[in-house]
Regions:
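Non-heme Fe(II)/2-oxoglutarate
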Residues: 1-83, 94, 101
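Karyopherin-beta/Importin-beta family HEAT-repeat alpha-solenoid scaffold
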Residues: 3-8, 166, 177-178
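Beta-strand secondary-structure signal
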Residues: 17, 113-115, 189-191
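Short histidine-centered beta-strand/loop micro-motifs
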Residues: 83, 102-107, 179-182
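Catalytic core of non-heme Fe(II) oxygenases with the double-stranded beta-helix
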Residues: 94-169, 186, 196, 200
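Histidine-centered metal-chelating micro-motifs
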Residues: 100-101, 173-177
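Short, compositionally biased
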Residues: 181-190
């Protein structure tokens, strides 16, 4: 019997990746900025961070501020967002020492969320996303061949390795966590939320 077979992937979940060219030219300034915030607010806030330091939220709206200016430039180059769409961005800085991690969470009351890695050494803790398909069973996923799973990104979880100067933007409803920092250095990142609105 001849069969014509095809797979149609519906309801994809886009993860947008930006790599900043020449990031090393501004990296030290951003690192100093992060530690400066921690010095001003040593206690930080506790949300999903286990052992790590997290700053209070702040809006990205000050062109004269080094981090704000950098983030505005990055997000203004978002190639798939319509020009007529306004983005309101709030952010916070994370400093995870060796042994620190972030538990599973999502970001409510916004449209997109993201992370920018400022300092990320080897084994500093991958970001892990969980499949949003709530009723997907382990048996179903593990019954498929490796080629099928790889070509369709069909997994329960998906990892990204932190890379300095890389930004990921993802749907805010997507559950995710940050694995333990197993390096000997601090892992520094900026997390942010984006609220979208149409001018027209």
């Amino acid at each position: 019997m001849d069969l014509n077979y095809k797979v149609t992937n519906i309801f994809p979940v886009p993860i947008h990746q930006f790599d900043v060219n020449g990031f090393d030219e501004i990296q030290n300034e951003l690192i100093d900025y992060a530690y400066g915030l921690k010095k001003k607010e040593p206690k930080g806030v506790l949300i999903s961070n286990y052992g790590g330091w997290q700053s209070s939220n702040f809006y990205i709206d000050n062109e004269d501020d080094v981090l704000h200016h950098f983030m505005i430039n990055c997000l203004s180059g978002f190639p798939v967002i319509k020009v007529s769409v306004n983005m309101k961005v709030d952010a916070w800085v994370n400093i995870n020492k060796p042994g620190d991690y972030n538990t599973k969470h999502h970001h409510p009351a916004c449209d997109l969320s993201g992370v920018l890695w400022i300092k990320a050494s080897k084994d500093c803790g991958k970001i892990e996303f969980q499949s949003p398909v709530e009723f997907q069973t382990y048996t179903e996923v593990e019954s498929y061949t490796k080629d099928f799973k790889d070509s369709n990104n069909y997994y329960h979880t998906y990892y990204f390795t932190p890379t300095q100067g890389r930004m990921l933007v993802f749907p805010s409803h997507l559950q995710h966590q940050v694995r333990e920092n197993k390096s000997n250095e601090d892992r520094i990142s900026v997390s942010f939320n984006i609220r979208l609105s149409n001018e027209n």
